[in-house]
Design a protein with these regions (language model features):
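Beta-strand-rich extracellular passenger or scaffold domains
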Residues: 1-458
Length: 458
C-alpha cells in the first residue's frame, strides 16, 4: 500500500492544500497509510478502502471511504455528499461529519477520556450531518451538533453522547446520553446502568427505562411518553415536565404538580417550595425530598425508601410499617427515618413520636414530644436549645447525640447493647437511665442524675 505524508502543510482540511493523494471519480485507493502532514482526498465518485490514518494525518471525503482506522490524532472529514462506512476511531482520533455528510457503522473508542461530558472536542465523533448505527465504547464520545442527527446508536459503559441536535433510537447499555438546550432525543432505551439526562431546554420523547436504568430530567427539561418499568429510576423535580406510565399507571410532573410518581433504585423527586406531589410511592433506593413550602400528600414509604424534609414542609402518608405519619403546621407526627432519611425540626416546632432507624434527625430548637426513638445508626443533631419533656429512647445498637443542648423534664433511656455517644452536648433532663449498653461522653455536660444498671458502662 501507499504511504502519504504530505498535503496538510496549510492546515487541517484546508482547500488551500494541493498535495497528498487524490482519488477522483471512478478511482479507488486501497490499503493506504496516511501519516503526519499527510492527506488523502476522496472526491465525489471516488472510493478509498482499508485506509489507516495516524499521527495527525487526515482524510477529506466527498466520495466513499470504507473501513478507515483513525489512530493517534488521525482525522477524517466527511463533507456534504460524502460517506464513511465502518470507520474505527481509536485514542485521540477524530471524525467530523459535516452538513450533508453521512457516517454509518462507526466504532468510537475515544473522546470521553476526561470523564462524562468533559469539555473535549478534539477527539471522538462530531456530527453535523448524519450518523447511523454508531457503536460508542468505553471512553468514546459522540457530539451531535445542532445541525446533526444520529440514528440507531449503541452506547456502552464509559461512553457518552452529547445531543444539541437530534438523536433517535439510542440504546444505553451502561452509557450516558446528555440532551442539551434545543436538543431532542426520541425512542431512547435505557438498560442497566444507562443514564439519560435531559437538561434545561432539552426534550425527550418515548424513553423506556428498564431495571437499574436512570432517566434524569432537570429543571426546564421535558420528557414525554416515558415508560418506566419496574426497577427503573426517575430523577426529577417539580420544575421539570415529565409524563408517562409506571407500574401504578399514568404519572405526570407538570406545572409544579407531580402525581403517581414511583421512586426506586436511585430515583428521586424534589418537591420545590409552592409545588405539590400526590400519590408518591417511595420504595427501596428511592428518595422524596420535600422542600420548605412544598407539599406531598398520600405518600407511601416502602422499606429502604428515603424521606428528606423539614417542619416547614407539608407531608402526609404511611410509613413502611403501615403507620400514618404527618408533617404540617409546625408539627411532625410519627415520622420514621430510615437510613439516608433526614428531617429537620425548626425552632418553635414540635416532633412527636419520632423513630430514627439509621437516619438523621436535626433539631434547631423546637420540642421533642412523646417517645423519640434512636435505633442502630441513628444520629440526633441539636442546634441551640431543644426541649424534651417526654422520653428519648436509645435501643439496640449504636447511636449519636451531638451538639446543642437538650433541656426539659424528660428522660434519656438507653436499653439494649451498643453505645450511645453524646458529643459536644449539654444534657439537662430529669434523669438519664442507662439500663443496658454503654454511655460515652465526649466534651459534653450532664446536669442530671445518671442511673446505671449493673453490667453497663459509663
Amino acid at each position: 500500500g501507499v504511504t502519504v505524508s504530505t498535503g496538510l502543510e496549510l492546515g487541517p482540511d484546508s482547500d488551500e492544500n494541493t498535495g497528498g493523494q487524490w482519488i477522483k471519480a471512478g478511482g479507488t485507493g486501497r490499503n493506504t497509510t496516511v501519516t503526519a502532514n499527510g492527506r488523502q482526498i476522496v472526491q465525489a465518485g471516488g472510493t478509498a478502502s482499508d485506509t489507516v490514518i495516524r499521527d495527525g494525518g487526515g482524510q477529506s471525503l466527498n466520495g466513499l471511504a470504507v473501513n478507515t482506522t483513525l489512530d493517534n490524532r488521525g482525522e477524517q472529514w466527511v463533507h456534504g455528499g460524502g460517506k464513511a462506512a465502518g470507520t474505527i476511531i481509536n485514542q485521540d482520533g477524530y471524525q467530523t461529519i459535516k452538513h450533508g455528510g453521512l457516517a454509518t457503522g462507526t466504532i468510537v473508542n475515544t473522546g470521553a477520556e476526561g470523564g462524562p461530558e468533559s469539555e473535549n472536542v478534539s477527539s471522538g465523533q462530531m456530527v453535523g450531518g448524519t450518523a447511523e448505527s454508531t457503536t460508542i465504547n468505553k471512553n468514546g464520545r459522540q457530539v451531535i451538533w445542532s445541525s446533526g442527527m444520529a440514528r440507531d446508536t449503541l452506547i456502552y459503559a464509559g461512553g457518552d453522547q452529547t445531543v444539541h441536535g437530534e438523536a433517535h433510537n439510542t440504546r444505553l447499555e451502561g452509557g450516558n446520553q446528555y440532551v442539551h438546550n434545543g436538543g431532542t432525543a426520541t425512542e431512547t432505551l435505557i438498560n442497566r446502568d444507562g443514564w439519560q439526562v435531559i437538561k434545561e431546554g432539552g426534550t425527550a420523547a418515548h424513553t423506556t427505562i428498564n431495571q437499574k436504568g436512570k432517566l434524569q430530567v432537570n429543571a426546564g427539561g421535558k420528557a414525554s411518553d416515558v415508560t418506566q418499568n419496574t426497577g427503573g429510576a426517575l430523577v426529577t423535580s417539580t420544575a421539570a415536565t415529565v409524563t408517562g406510565t409506571n407500574r401504578l399507571g399514568a404519572f405526570s410532573v407538570v406545572a409544579g404538580k407531580a402525581d403517581n410518581v414511583v421512586l426506586e433504585n436511585g430515583g428521586r423527586l424534589d418537591v420545590l417550595s409552592g409545588h405539590t406531589a400526590t400519590n408518591t410511592r417511595v420504595d427501596d433506593g428511592g428518595t422524596l425530598d420535600v422542600r420548605n413550602g412544598g407539599a406531598a400528600t398520600t405518600v407511601s414509604m416502602g422499606n429502604g425508601g428515603v424521606l428528606l424534609a423539614d417542619s416547614g414542609a407539608a407531608v402526609s402518608g404511611t410509613r413502611s410499617d403501615g403507620t400514618a405519619f404527618r408533617i404540617g403546621g409546625g408539627q411532625a407526627d410519627a415520622l420514621m427515618l430510615e437510613k439516608g432519611s433526614s428531617f429537620t425540626l425548626n425552632a418553635g416546632d414540635t416532633a412527636t413520636d419520632t423513630t430514627v432507624n439509621g437516619g438523621l434527625f436535626t433539631a434547631r430548637g423546637g420540642t421533642l414530644a412523646g417517645t423519640t426513638t434512636l435505633n442502630n445508626g441513628a444520629i440526633l443533631t441539636l442546634s441551640g436549645k431543644t426541649v424534651n419533656n417526654d422520653t428519648l429512647t436509645i435501643r439496640e445498637g449504636d447511636a449519636l447525640l451531638q451538639g446543642g443542648s437538650l433541656t426539659g423534664n424528660g428522660s434519656v433511656e438507653k436499653s439494649g447493647s451498643g453505645t450511645l455517644t453524646v458529643s459536644n452536648t449539654t444534657l439537662t433532663q430529669k434523669a438519664v437511665n442507662l439500663n443496658e449498653g454503654t454511655l460515652t461522653l465526649n466534651d459534653s455536660t450532664v446536669t442530671t442524675d445518671v442511673i446505671a444498671q449493673r453490667g453497663t458502662a459509663l
